[in-house]
Regions:
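Acidic, turn/loop-rich segments in luminal/extracellular domains of secretory-pathway
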Residues: 1-73, 77-88, 92-171, 176-180
């Protein structure tokens, strides 16, 4: 049962020594590693036994990519003119996700901020009108949206969609044959 001292040393392969530290017989990261930022770390370690005999080796630590939830959910537009046709695109969703190739499924969900979910629908990554939206009836429609990736990570956001008032054509005007 020989005692050994272990240390990080400069030399070939020590490029990432500053990101790690040794405590006792264990190696620790100074901060949480992130596969998307840096997938592997190169370090050089020296081991010295009680008799002073030492050896040095270069090591590569390869991180495993773990799927992470999106950090925010956005929509490309939050306003639309009133009385547009059904299935008119209001906006397109985008999930900011550290996993750049992650696919998202968007759905409307109940809860706080879902008061207008029944007037809107989602097709793929697009928010569409499901009825003719009328500024005079309501000038803000609130929808609650869930983005879920293929492993089940979820993020929910509420969007307030402003309905722009459009000058409606006059109606109910009857021409008269008499002038005065």
């Amino acid at each position: 049962n020989d005692n050994h001292s272990i240390s990080l040393v400069p030399g070939d392969g020590s490029e990432d020594n500053d990101a790690l530290l040794i405590g006792g017989q264990k190696l620790y990261f100074k901060s949480n590693p992130d596969f998307e930022a840096k997938p592997n770390y190169s370090l050089r370690i020296r081991v010295v036994d009680a008799g002073g005999i030492s050896t040095e080796n270069k090591f590569i630590i390869n991180l495993i990519d773990i799927n992470e939830a999106g950090t925010s959910l956005e929509i490309s537009a939050q306003q639309i003119d009133e009385n547009v046709d059904l299935n008119t695109v209001v906006g397109q969703f985008k999930t900011n996700d550290p996993d750049t190739n992650d696919q998202q499924v968007y759905t409307l969900v109940s809860g706080k901020g879902a008061s207008s979910n029944n007037l809107i629908l989602i097709s793929g990554d697009k928010l569409l009108t499901n009825t003719q939206l009328n500024h005079k009836a309501n000038d803000i429609y609130s929808v609650r949206t869930l983005a879920e990736d293929l492993v089940g990570n979820k993020i929910v956001s509420v969007f307030d969609i402003k309905i722009n008032d459009v000058n409606d054509a006059p109606s109910g005007i009857q021409p008269s044959s008499s002038l005065q």
